[in-house]
Every structure is written in structure tokens, then in C-alpha cells.
């Protein structure tokens, strides 16, 4: 009875079990299956991992080319040659965020307050007047108001 139902399922789904077990393609001694391209589970996992690493490696050089530092050549006045054979490399390495107050050097951790001047301060020095902030809040405020409220000039009215 059970064998008949298995045969019916195999006919309906179109999946047939092989008559003889298939050895792994990589000759590791284990049996493979059609779902894993005739490889055992370990060999299949290794090949999938290798394929994903290969695709990541192919994509990575494209990203690294765009983020490479700029190389500029310093030339003499009119000779057109590179001065002393040196090349100047510009690197923009972002600094890690500071976890200390810039005024008192107290550790602030996650409770630090970031100022518009670019510093991190403790609760005592978080205000602009307490840490002698160099950021011009008034000028930035004026610029924001000017952007948000453009000057509207109407056309002159012609008198009849």
C-alpha cells in the first residue's frame, strides 16, 4: 500500500529517486544528491561559500577604486618634471568620535553632547557660552531665515 502511494507521488511530482546512490563529484567518499549538484552537503556548502566570497571580491575593487586617495604630482615651474620624484598623497581618514569632553577631558560615553562646532562636551560644558564655541549661531540663523523667506518683489503698478 505505502509503495503504491510513493509511486503515485513520484509520478505526480515528476521527482524520481535514482536507482543507485550517487557519489560526490569531488570524490570525498560521501553520497551526493541532485539538489546539491551531485555533491555531498559539506562540499556543496564549501562551493557556495567560495562563490559568495568570489562575488564579494569582484564587487569590492570597484568600491575601493572610488575611495582611493587622490595622488597629485608636484611639478617644477616650467620643466614639467616631478619635483624630487615625490608624490603627495591626500588621505581623508575620518577620526573616530571622541568620548571625552573637549573642555575638561571628562569621559562622557553615550551621554555626551555634540556641538555644531564639532566637539563633544559633558553636561557642564554643553552650552555654547560655557565652552567658548566658535560656531556663529546668529549668522546661520540669518541664512536659514533668508532661505526660508525669500524676498518677494512685486512689479511696479503703472498709473492710468
UniProtKB/Swiss-Prot annotation:
One of its GO terms (molecular function) is DNA binding. Induction: By dehydration and salt stress. Zn(2+) 2 binds at residues 101, 104, 122, 125. InterPro entries: AN1-like_Znf, AN1_A20_ZnFinger, Znf_A20, Znf_AN1. Pfam families: zf-A20, zf-AN1. Disulfide bonds: none annotated. A zinc finger (AN1-type) spans 95-141. It comes from the Eukaryota. Keywords: Metal-binding, Stress response, Zinc, Zinc-finger. Zn(2+) 1 binds at residues 24, 28, 40, 43. Transmembrane segments: none annotated. SMART domains: ZnF_A20, ZnF_AN1. The keyword Mitochondrion does not apply. Residues 73-94 are annotated as: Disordered. A zinc finger (A20-type) spans 18-52. Zn(2+) 3 binds at residues 115, 117, 131, 133. May be involved in environmental stress response. This is Zinc finger A20 and AN1 domain-containing stress-associated protein 6. The gene is SAP6.
Amino acid at each position: 500500500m505505502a509503495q503504491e502511494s510513493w509511486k503515485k507521488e513520484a509520478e505526480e511530482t515528476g521527482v524520481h529517486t535514482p536507482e543507485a546512490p550517487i557519489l560526490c563529484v569531488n570524490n570525498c567518499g560521501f553520497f551526493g544528491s541532485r539538489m546539491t549538484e551531485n555533491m555531498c552537503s559539506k562540499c556543496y556548502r564549501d562551493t557556495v561559500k567560495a562563490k559568495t566570497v568570489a562575488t564579494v571580491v569582484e564587487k569590492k575593487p570597484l568600491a575601493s577604486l572610488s575611495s582611493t586617495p587622490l595622488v597629485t604630482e608636484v611639478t617644477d615651474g616650467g620643466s614639467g618634471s616631478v619635483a624630487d620624484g615625490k608624490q603627495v598623497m591626500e588621505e581623508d581618514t575620518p577620526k573616530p568620535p571622541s568620548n571625552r569632553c573637549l573642555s575638561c577631558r571628562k569621559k562622557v560615553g553615550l551621554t555626551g553632547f555634540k556641538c555644531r562646532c564639532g566637539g563633544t562636551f559633558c553636561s557642564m560644558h554643553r552650552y555654547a557660552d560655557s565652552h567658548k564655541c566658535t560656531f556663529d549661531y546668529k549668522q546661520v540663523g540669518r541664512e536659514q531665515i533668508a532661505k526660508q523667506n525669500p524676498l518677494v518683489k512685486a512689479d511696479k503698478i503703472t498709473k492710468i
